[in-house]
Amino acid sequence: GLRSKGIYVLLIRQTQVSDFQRIFDINATEEEKTSRIDLARITQLDSWSDYHKVVVVEDEIIGFLLVMSEASHYDGDNFRWFVERYSRFLYVDRIVIDRTFARRGVGSALYSDLIKFAATQSWSTLCCEINVSPPNPVSHGFHARFGFKEVGRSSKAGAPKVVSYQVAEI
């Protein structure tokens, strides 16, 4: 097919329950950069999300983007950090792309779709956190291209991770 020639059509669509196993599989390859989630947690996160879409190429899910608004019941500590400081925002819980398609514009296509969605709902602030330790330079570069800037840092006592809190005004 076209995919073998490096030519493919990206379809971005709303996530369905039948996608959760593939989301689990893709996330499992990047747990050190995101965090571990099981199927029950994916179901819960999906129920709290305001935007949860997958990218499909030739009927195969190759990535996903999971986002909550400030009004979400999401229980994450990093999300709460933003709730305490910003009144209206969209929080990127995770964006994960299959390694086969890394650095080919798939993440950018998802973020462009998210920004369009945000505009329809009058959201102008995107928030996320990026690992500083262990470092995630690919994510830092990707988010910088979308205008994300550091607004704080967090490290939990005894925890191996240090994160950079990032905000982009869109």
Enumerate the predicted regions with their spans:
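Conserved active-site alpha-helix within GNAT-family acetyltransferase domains
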Residues: V132-G152
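Conserved acetyl-CoA-binding loop-helix of GNAT-fold acetyltransferases
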Residues: I97, R103-K116, R145
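A short beta-loop-alpha structural element at the N-terminal edge
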Residues: L10-D25
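Conserved acyl-donor/pantetheine-binding loop and adjacent beta-alpha core of acyl/acetyltransferases
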Residues: L66-R94, G158
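Active-site rim helix/loop that mediates acceptor-substrate recognition in acyltransferases
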Residues: E32-E58
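Glycine-rich phosphate/pyrophosphate-binding loop shared by adenosine-nucleotide-utilizing enzymes
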Residues: L10, E60-F64, L90
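C-terminal "cap" of GNAT-fold acetyltransferases
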Residues: E84, R153-I170
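Conserved GNAT acetyl-CoA-binding A-motif
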Residues: A118-V132
